């Protein structure tokens, strides 16, 4: 994944206006059971500000998490776009597990499990677990957000093991550094930073690398943005 792209990895359809985002009702056909599913989609989103170092976007886009996952109450399938087709036999064991439709973090986690079962550990499964963590951040549930960050980090490990391009992409390491630093896994953050030194060469990545090194050495587990890198490094 190119470094110029990863800064915008979570972007959904956005229109830059002065208005708050709108919600559109829609009906889609479930990609597993072929039944109609009523969904709500966030549109006309204005994003102003700097993204977090773990890729979470600035407001208003950061406030649309519950509209970034869709759930079929008929079969239990969930995915960012419920119309994505999948073979039920590969994910049936996941769909049969009980889940609360309004537990947004659990829906993201189920989508990650579906991706792993249907394909393999990937950047998508990493991001889905990370979004589950963001939901728990907003709910002030530190224990659950830490659990989901650990799962996200493990997915990135597995993804980079199987993908040669992914494991030589500097921003993958820097994103994962932020994920593990936030949960206080300083040892793993240091190991990742040592590898990131080899690959974090493009654009703003060297600045983020230096910033993360300071945070890790200070055992700082706080949330920071790209803007913080540019201002606090000066």
Predicted feature residues:
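Alpha-helical linker/edge segments of TPR/alpha-solenoid repeat scaffolds
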Residues: 175-188, 213-234
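Amphipathic alpha-helical repeat scaffolds of TPR domains
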Residues: 84-97, 105-140, 167-182
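Boundary/linker segments of alpha-helical solenoid repeat arrays
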Residues: 159-169, 198-213
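Alpha-helical junction/boundary sensor with strong preference for TPR arrays
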Residues: 114-118, 136, 155-163, 199-201
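TPR/TPR-like (Sel1-like) alpha-helical repeat modules
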Residues: 186-202
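Bacterial N-terminal signal peptides
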Residues: 7-15
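N-terminal cysteine/histidine-rich coordination modules
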Residues: 18-93
């Amino acid at each position: 994944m190119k470094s110029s792209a990863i800064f915008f990895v979570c972007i959904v359809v956005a229109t830059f206006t002065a208005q708050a985002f709108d919600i559109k009702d829609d009906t889609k056909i479930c990609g597993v059971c072929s039944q109609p599913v009523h969904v709500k989609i966030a549109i006309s989103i204005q994003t102003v500000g700097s993204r977090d170092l773990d890729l979470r976007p600035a407001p208003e886009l950061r406030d649309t998490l519950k509209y970034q996952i869709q759930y079929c109450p008929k079969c239990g399938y969930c995915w960012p776009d419920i119309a994505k087709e999948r073979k039920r036999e590969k994910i049936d064991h996941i769909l049969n597990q009980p889940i609360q439709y309004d537990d947004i973090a659990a829906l993201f986690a189920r989508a990650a499990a579906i991706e792993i079962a249907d394909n393999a550990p990937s950047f998508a499964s990493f991001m889905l677990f990370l979004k589950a963590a963001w939901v728990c951040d907003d709910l002030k549930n530190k224990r659950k957000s830490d659990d989901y960050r650990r799962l996200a980090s493990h997915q990135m490990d597995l993804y980079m093991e199987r993908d040669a391009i992914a494991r030589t992409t500097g921003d993958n390491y820097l994103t994962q550094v932020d994920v593990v630093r936030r949960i206080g896994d300083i040892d793993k953050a240091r190991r990742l930073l040592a590898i990131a030194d080899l690959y974090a060469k493009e654009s703003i990545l060297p600045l983020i690398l230096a910033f993360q090194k300071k945070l890790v050495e200070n055992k700082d587990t706080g949330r920071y943005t790209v803007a913080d890198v540019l201002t606090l490094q000066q």
